[in-house]
């Protein structure tokens, strides 16, 4: 399945719009506790542990998005937008959300 941030796909023609779809993943507070305990992971101002968890959450959100697209009969998703939001007590939760338009391309 093609998933892209662009509104169209070069060399492909959109023949049907199936609808707006979304996928989400939420990281619980325990990841932030683990991160503060694992400060030694930080190299050059970056935390490898945190980045790996974000990558996992992003992959989960994108997989959920694609599952919704397939359920609508789409073979591509265009115009995707990834967002990251913190919430909860002391911003202890992180949500990764992705949305886009499910389409059929030829």
Curated annotation (Swiss-Prot):
<protein>
    <recommendedName>
        <fullName>UPF0145 protein VC_A0951</fullName>
    </recommendedName>
</protein>
<comment type="similarity">
    <text>Belongs to the UPF0145 family.</text>
</comment>
<dbReference type="InterPro" id="IPR002765">
    <property type="entry name" value="UPF0145_YbjQ-like"/>
</dbReference>
<dbReference type="InterPro" id="IPR035439">
    <property type="entry name" value="UPF0145_dom_sf"/>
</dbReference>
<dbReference type="Pfam" id="PF01906">
    <property type="entry name" value="YbjQ_1"/>
</dbReference>
